[in-house]
Structures are given as C-alpha cells and as structure tokens.
C-alpha cells in the first residue's frame, strides 16, 4: 500500500503538481488538495503546517520517509493535483 502512495507522490512531482517544504506550502498560490509530512518534522513546523491545513480545509497525513522525499531533503510535500490527492487519501485511510 505504501508503494502506491510513493508512486502517486512521484507522479505529482513529475507532473509539476507538488510543492516541497513547509515555507513553500504555506505561501503557494496553487490549490493544495492534500499535505503529507514525515515524523521527523519539527514541532514548530508541524504546528505551522497544521494551522495552514486547517485554514484552507485540506487533510494532512504523517507518512514514512520515502526515498523520494529523502533525495529532495524534504519533510513536507503538498499535492496540488485533485485526482492524485484523492488516490493518496484513499490509500492512507
């Protein structure tokens, strides 16, 4: 199941429908559909991310540290494609 989520994240990156990092996510002008973060995200960044997710009304999930995120040295990613976000949400529930 987690391989599917990692694949969907890869698809969104290749499509250009992903935003990396807490700072970039909170200031993006793209329409965010789901936010994913790793467990190693700092508490302050996590609170900023949760506040932003609640403000715009999108789900936020904690995921494993996938290879894709480790290569980018990234702890948070937002998916801006509606269909990919829906597939990720369904696989994480």
Residue ranges and their predicted role:
Residues 4-34:
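N-terminal first-folded block
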């Amino acid at each position: 199941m987690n391989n599917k989520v990692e694949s969907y994240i890869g698809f969104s990156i290749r499509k250009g429908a992903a935003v990396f990092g807490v700072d970039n996510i909170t200031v993006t002008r793209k329409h965010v559909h789901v936010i994913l973060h790793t467990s190693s995200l700092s508490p302050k960044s996590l609170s900023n991310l949760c506040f932003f997710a609640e403000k715009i009304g999108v789900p936020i999930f904690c995921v494993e540290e996938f290879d894709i995120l480790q290569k980018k040295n990234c702890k948070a990613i937002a998916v801006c494609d509606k269909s990919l976000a829906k597939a990720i949400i369904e696989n994480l529930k």
